[in-house]
Amino acid sequence: MNAWNTIYERFNPIAFSLGGIEVHWYGLAYACAIVVAFYMALRMIQKDPKRFPIERKEFESYFLWAELGIVLGARIGYVLIYEPNSSYYLTHFWQIFNPFDSHGNFIGIRGMSYHGGLVGFLIASYLYSRKDLKKLLIYLDLIAISLPLGYVFGRIGNFLNQELFGRIVPKDSHLGQIIGIMVDNELRYPSQLIEAFLEGVVVFLMVMWAKKHTKTHGLLIVVYGLGYSLMRFIAEFYREPDSQLGVYFLNLSMGQILSVFMVIVSLGILLYATKNSKKIKEE
């Protein structure tokens, strides 16, 4: 047993309290994710105006729409897919976004679905650009290149918040014994950090490679969608399936099943891009 294995014993998921409200590391990490994604996108607009012919004010307006779509979609998606009492929320819709418990204590909004956030993001992007659909693929590409690094902070936030634990490490796994985290007296994979690396860093490198080698609007979001789906499918083998759902056919988790659907959506965007997008003009 090493110091890393027992890090949760010495770490408090609450960063500080402000006016009686407990601020969690996850909230701070999520704020960092938004800031990183925003400024990464601005940097891309400045460095490659031919690929991203968007004014800053225009992007700022779009970013608000996209972020709102992500938050709404992520929360509603969680309630519909993962929440055991989803029927209650369907009849008490306002409770989905209620940050207070029945006693009036602030507990924040807990439970977000990445795939739900993706749906919300796509809907928001379409609604924002419906008057000029030629820019839709440009917006999607811009988010595809700025989202992965922000995603890293989100998964680190999950780790600091001590949630979304990994599967139990087999006793014969030497690497697992080194990197595992003790949770309720069981050594588990740090799946949140594995996801941060695979779905964040690796996917970012994939999209950057695509940016260098492709000249058609819409291909970056396709590479992101396919790359994320693959990395999420792999990472799910180290992540404990949601207790209320378990696994399905072929022992696949809900995250893996949704990743398959994400591949289908990505291929649909690819078909749309090849028919409706023009190549980026060279200097």
Swiss-Prot record:
Gene Ontology annotations of biological process type: lipoprotein biosynthetic process
UniProt GO molecular function: phosphatidylglycerol-prolipoprotein diacylglyceryl transferase activity
Pathway given in the UniProt record: Protein modification; lipoprotein biosynthesis (diacylglyceryl transfer)
Keyword Transmembrane: yes
One CC-aspect GO term: plasma membrane
Topological relation to the membrane, as annotated: Multi-pass membrane protein
Residue stretches spanning the membrane: 18-38, 62-82, 106-126, 136-156, 190-210, 218-238, 252-272
Keyword Cell inner membrane: yes
Pfam families: LGT (PF01790)
Cell compartment(s), UniProt: Cell inner membrane
Keywords annotated in UniProt: Cell inner membrane, Cell membrane, Membrane, Transferase, Transmembrane, Transmembrane helix
UniProt EC number: 2.5.1.145
InterPro entries, per the entry: Lgt
Chain positions recorded as a 1,2-diacyl-sn-glycero-3-phospho-(1'-sn-glycerol) binding sites: 155
PANTHER family xrefs: PHOSPHATIDYLGLYCEROL--PROLIPOPROTEIN DIACYLGLYCERYL TRANSFERASE (PTHR30589:SF0), PROLIPOPROTEIN DIACYLGLYCERYL TRANSFERASE (PTHR30589)
Family of the protein in this entry: Belongs to the Lgt family.
Protein's job: Catalyzes the transfer of the diacylglyceryl group from phosphatidylglycerol to the sulfhydryl group of the N-terminal cysteine of a prolipoprotein, the first step in the formation of mature lipoproteins.
Name of the protein this chain belongs to: Phosphatidylglycerol--prolipoprotein diacylglyceryl transferase
Organism: Helicobacter pylori (strain J99 / ATCC 700824)
